[in-house]
Amino acid sequence: MKLWVSALLMAWFGVLSCVQAEFFTSIGHMTDLIYAEKELVQSLKEYILVEEAKLSKIKSWANKMEALTSKSAADAEGYLAHPVNAYKLVKRLNTDWPALEDLVLQDSAAGFIANLSVQRQFFPTDEDEIGAAKALMRLQDTYRLDPGTISRGELPGTKYQAMLSVDDCFGMGRSAYNEGDYYHTVLWMEQVLKQLDAGEEATTTKSQVLDYLSYAVFQLGDLHRALELTRRLLSLDPSHERAGGNLRYFEQLLEEEREKTLTNQTEAELATPEGIYERPVDYLPERDVYESLCRGEGVKLTPRRQKRLFCRYHHGNRAPQLLIAPFKEEDEWDSPHIVRYYDVMSDEEIERIKEIAKPKLARATVRDPKTGVLTVASYRVSKSSWLEEDDDPVVARVNRRMQHITGLTVKTAELLQVANYGVGGQYEPHFDFSRNDERDTFKHLGTGNRVATFLNYMSDVEAGGATVFPDLGAAIWPKKGTAVFWYNLLRSGEGDYRTRHAACPVLVGCKWVSNKWFHERGQEFLRPCGSTEVD
């Protein structure tokens, strides 16, 4: 059994070693951790069985010796008068007790420790824990969830109950604190206090929570509350040196505030109201619109616009393959024209593509607009891989299908990109095409700019994960087996800035997509230029 478990563990290690860190960016890779942990539990249970068997032997020996020594000690000389008893005493002390010593000293934990030590090389890192915590906070902000809701696991579309303990919530707050995110530190440390006050058992103490919380509210400008929390901390732990120093510092600042002249009163009035904190100003100008659309709010699909949207059978410019079996086409938006196609990929094709892509998944990157260098970014949380037609016949088949549907050639298109989104996986608002003020992103390809995007949804998503267009007020929800298509460039070759779009954070579920980006070269006669710059 030990050999079997070790071999199985090593098989999982082989998978995990290819993944390396950043597990939180791909649910597909996190599933490997589930199975690895399951095997680790099996190894632990085997260790427990061995320890229990060993302890059972020791207990049996102890009980036997207790009965024997009680009898022999009651009449030592009478007991030893029997020569057999004398022999057995000598034998026990010379042979049996050393054998028991060997049993006690047996290190049955060695196998388990060896397995654990090997596997720890492939465990998630501090970066993963921080990334997963930030993902939960991203979901908290985007979908307006309070920490209590998340802690209770009350999320839409969930199949399994999952709750955060006091220690889990403390970990969330500490991760935020270490990132200098005092807004979320306060929210999560307050949740910790609520659960502690409710009587939940934990290793985390109120003193620890108040230590973080008092400094966080101070950083948010709430001096009065920082002082009150510090006093609470000292009432619980009078010997807390840092709290003592902070108390004196806060009292000094408060005294200086009280001594402000009337001319500076306006400044004092502008201080943060006690206990009320606002989310910091974000770097993304359209943040509010983007997040509203992710929640299904603010969609500008008016009745008038809806009347211009239709469903039809699409024959792909009368391609022979589609004349026999046309695709169902549905208008998602009128201008720019965004369409959805149904039954583009079968379940079998999807599973095969995921199977091929999974070993190749790596953290998705973005191209720095100033340097042109590919780099990871916090606003794109997913893993992706690129599939060639030689990888499997299904890739070539899907490529041909996209060519027939769009009427564009795939000869100059990019490889099929497969992406899997992790915890709170997202891709904030971006353009698929290269802008004039950037380095020529696609110069090395020699095929021009990205003229069109074909996005395949390869999974349903229980909650979240929409594709939204902030400038349009459009939101498109994932449906397994469907695909959406739009042109990134006007017929003049100029970029259509209305196509700025985003992949909303996945609230519940596992999101798989694949992208095919068509380029300008080769499309000259398939999508001719327009007569004006705005065509």
Swiss-Prot record:
Encoding gene (name): P4HA2
Protein name in the entry: Prolyl 4-hydroxylase subunit alpha-2
GO function term, MF aspect, one: electron transfer activity
Compartment(s) of residence: Endoplasmic reticulum lumen
Keyword field: Dioxygenase, Disease variant, Endoplasmic reticulum, Glycoprotein, Iron, Metal-binding, Oxidoreductase, Signal, TPR repeat, Vitamin C
Assembly, per entry: Heterotetramer of two alpha-2 chains and two beta chains (P4HB) (the beta chain is the multi-functional PDI), where P4HB plays the role of a structural subunit; this tetramer catalyzes the formation of 4-hydroxyproline in collagen.
GO cellular component: cytosol; endoplasmic reticulum; endoplasmic reticulum lumen; intracellular membrane-bounded organelle; nucleoplasm
Gene3D superfamilies assigned: 6.10.140.1460, q2cbj1_9rhob like domain, Tetratricopeptide repeat domain
Broad EC category: oxidoreductase
Binding site for 2-oxoglutarate: K511
PROSITE patterns: FE2OG_OXY, TPR, TPR_REGION
Known outcome of mutating I150V: In MYP25; uncertain significance
Main location: endoplasmic reticulum
UniProt note on tissues of expression: Expressed in the heart, placenta, lung and pancreas.
Family indicated by similarity: Belongs to the P4HA family.
Species whose genome carries this gene: Homo sapiens
Cofactor(s) required, per the database record: Fe(2+); L-ascorbate
Record note on cofactor: Binds 1 Fe(2+) ion per subunit.
Record field: catalytic activity: L-prolyl-[collagen] + 2-oxoglutarate + O2 = trans-4-hydroxy-L-prolyl-[collagen] + succinate + CO2
Domain Fe2OG dioxygenase positions: 412-520
ATP-binding listed as a keyword: no
InterPro entries in alphabetical order: Oxoglu/Fe-dep_dioxygenase_dom (IPR005123), P4HA-like (IPR045054), Pro_4_hyd_alph (IPR006620), Pro_4_hyd_alph_FE2OG_OXY (IPR044862), Pro_4_hyd_alph_N (IPR013547), TPR-like_helical_dom_sf (IPR011990), TPR_rpt (IPR019734)
